[in-house]
């Protein structure tokens, strides 16, 4: 795998690797990260602590994907739910709002070091029941967040100053990548046309969203369609297509398109 790619789905083995009775679950990547973070940390912790822990979870997970750690050893899954090997993951558990929003904001990020291609296997422990010298502790990261540390400061405190937050635009299951800057009234081009076309398809399933001309010009009609979409899906209703809104629209577009194909 030459590039880091965010998978659309991963396969979670709900047990230890050699437990042949454990079930495999096919889970959307973002839903998996939200589940793990909700299982591993507290939603009331400082925002910077939540982000630091999510980044560590994502980087660890993407390392498993990138290196094909289990598949290269003959297993038919991506990762396990056993904390002796991987993260805690609980089927069908509830997701906390603060974690849900944080993952949507940074799901394409991971941690890297200079001259190392793959995402870093950022191991961690809770720091109370288990100690792990040289690795991040969850309660320690909470204390640093309380002191005002930023996510990268928290991470570098444990993993060293040569740790960096990286990102990838390679996202499976998404037809077109985020253009790099928010789209708003006055924006023009193919990215605007993409959003207009996708919102028009989504409006077939969510008729409150007004249809708009797919002309590549971001006018008030497009802003209104975006605002309505944001209101329906609990996003900030500002009529601006930033990172979070772009990928939410893209994900819904794929889902609605697939439903249409099978209906």
Which functions belong to the PLM regions below?
Residues 1-263:
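Conserved, single-site charged/polar hotspot
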